[in-house]
């Protein structure tokens, strides 16, 4: 019996006992996500009596249907959950290195980031063992209340009806054209020999059926069930290295995240490749002009990473849950409506090389901030190497600036790359002068931009998606 059969993990309806409320979420009950459709899925589950984890899991699965440029069922995730008694747990459902990590079929491509062209590896050999469904299953089993099939239902509905491309979607699609138009992607994202544009309907074949199977058989079907055998066969056909044994060995890992202090608050977040907790500690210990402190708290970060979404939810009992999920660029191969992740081709994540059957590193860092009075807010960010700086700025606004979620997300972002600091418009002149005085070269952007990442916030500070990434927040007041 594999790891999925241990400790009752094979039961799709098993959930953990729910604790009694002691935390406060004065900002209201709601969700935040990068897509209105994703947010709607989470809100429907809250309306049905679901927990924050139910909503977060449902949104993650729905995002696989309506945000296919950045996430799929064959991706990885990181999550954080704050229970009603304040207990905070992190869940790692990211991507594993397969047992045989080298060989296979690989291709090289280039992505144009608005004038900066960067090389990427794609193809089957870049596919890592996907932990997203394992992470969703674990979050639901530990912290959910609704039946599993009900949590998956909104994703099935969106996969069946399709979604209308937004202007942000069109921009992403055109940027990712070299991989999104391969294989099944050409059928999905092109029409009459051209790429689809804003306002046109996109529906991914076979995804609804795959989601129905996961709803009926539970998350383990992707790892030790019928679907796992299909996926292992498909992986071999496309030159991937993931085997049935690799899938069976992939499980979510739960742990207590480290805590650092900031202005009397507790900031709880994972480490791994994320430097966020170190940056928060530096910010708390430093003095001087605020903008310079924000930049000095940061350290040089990897230059590239693609394909991420973030979401957050709070429920009526005071629980909060945030998830960040990532596809990477994608391999260009599609299995039953889901593109394979390309994490083995993300060189920035391969710290220490490809070690067989190990969990890959990630910059993703869903985070909880808890006030001195016990009020909790969760947040996560998308944006590759800009994830920590986007979170740091938003946490700074909530904790030190005493701002609500909307105002904190709206703050001009500051992102350091070596001695160069990228800043968004509307940063005050005195703050820019402080950066220059601290020895930084300042590059001021002319408009608020998705380059600076997208933050989703829910909890005591309020509910807010990030307009830089087309995000929305929905709340019951």
Q: Where do the PLM segments sit?
A:
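Short, small/polar residue-rich loop motifs at catalytic or cofactor-binding pockets
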Residues: 254, 305-308, 362-364
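N-terminal accessory/precursor segments of enzymes
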Residues: 90-142, 266-287, 360-415
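Short Gly/Pro-enriched turn/cap motifs at secondary-structure boundaries
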Residues: 69, 125-126, 301-304, 355-361, ...
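Noncatalytic scaffold domains of N-terminal-nucleophile
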Residues: 2-44, 50-217, 222-224, 229-267, ...
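C-terminal catalytic domains of large/alpha subunits in multi-subunit enzymes
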Residues: 249-253, 290-305, 315-316, 369-373, ...
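Internal maturation/activation junctions in enzymes
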Residues: 265, 271-326, 336, 445
